[in-house]
């Protein structure tokens, strides 16, 4: 309309990274496991759909971060043999999609690692298959740090560049475990001159406000957050760049058909 506005010009940039050899090898092992797990389902009741959602959840966690894979293992998989399995009368798609995929409903969305479908699928597995899955997730959790985690290394590079250009970035992550991992790694690599804080769904509204209030006292600052901050908190006053660590994805693209 020819009139100046108070809104800054939005610049969107996509960047790429290549997984390290160690992460690539792990991902290929996980992909093979997921394919075999779904194919091995007996098809009784909802078992195959449960395993399908478990496979997507495993892939999401491994691709998000080593910490997200480790969180599933720590929170749920140690209790494998105690689970009764998924309810045959329940709808797996309705039960698991709020955890695994991006949703528009704030009441359904969660930033916790999607361990429920993995736990329910594990209850249908024989012991060797359970042990194989646990070993994969343990191996994934060992790849933490920029040496083996190229996604983290690329993010560190981007954040350093933004800070050098006097930006104050937010790094958005899908899962709590990933956000805490990224914040810890960024703080370690960036040093004491930069303040890095994670704010996630594990914090109350008051705790979120307090953590952000403390953070904005620092000239060089990085906020790492999940979508818990998508509503109710005005971030534009104190931050002026965004990095999306976990992009929405289609499982059919990440998991090509054989």
PLM region spans:
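Conserved helicase ATPase core of P-loop NTP-dependent helicases/translocases
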Residues: 193-226
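Conserved RecA-like helicase motor core of SF1/SF2 enzymes
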Residues: 202, 221, 227-258
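Glycine-rich phosphate-binding "P-loop"
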Residues: 131-153, 199
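Conserved helicase motor "Helicase C" RecA-like lobe of SF1/SF2 P-loop NTPases
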Residues: 174-198
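Inter-lobe coupling linker of SF2 helicases/translocases
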Residues: 1-92
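Short glycine-/polar-rich loops that comprise or flank the Walker A/P-loop
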Residues: 10-12, 166-167, 191-195, 218-220, ...
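Conserved interdomain hinge at the start of the Helicase C-terminal
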Residues: 26, 35-47, 146-174
């Amino acid at each position: 309309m020819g009139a100046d506005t108070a809104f800054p010009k939005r610049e969107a940039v996509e960047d790429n990274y290549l997984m390290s050899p160690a992460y690539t090898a792990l991902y290929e092992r996980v992909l093979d496991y997921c394919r075999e797990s779904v194919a091995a389902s007996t098809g009784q009741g909802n078992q195959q759909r449960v395993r399908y959602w478990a496979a997507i959840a495993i892939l999401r966690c491994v691709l998000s971060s080593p910490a997200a894979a480790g969180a599933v293992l720590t929170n749920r998989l140690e209790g494998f043999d105690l689970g009764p399995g998924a309810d045959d009368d329940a709808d797996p798609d309705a039960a698991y999609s709020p955890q695994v995929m991006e949703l528009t409903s704030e009441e359904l969305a969660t930033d916790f690692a999607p361990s429920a479908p993995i736990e329910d699928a594990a209850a249908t597995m024989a012991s060797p298959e359970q042990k194989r899955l646990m070993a994969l997730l343990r191996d994934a959790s060992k790849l933490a740090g920029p040496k083996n985690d190229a996604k983290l290394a690329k993010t560190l590079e981007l954040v350093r560049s933004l800070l050098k250009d006097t930006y104050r970035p937010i790094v958005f992550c899908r899962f709590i475990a990933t956000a805490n991992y990224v914040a810890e790694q960024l703080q370690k690599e960036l040093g004491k001159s930069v303040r890095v804080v994670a704010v996630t769904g594990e914090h109350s509204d008051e705790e979120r406000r307090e953590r952000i209030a403390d953070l904005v006292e620092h000239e060089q600052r990085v906020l790492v957050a999940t979508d818990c901050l998508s509503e109710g908190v005005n971030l534009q006053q104190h931050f002026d760049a965004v990095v999306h660590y976990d992009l929405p994805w289609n499982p059919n693209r990440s998991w090509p058909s054989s």
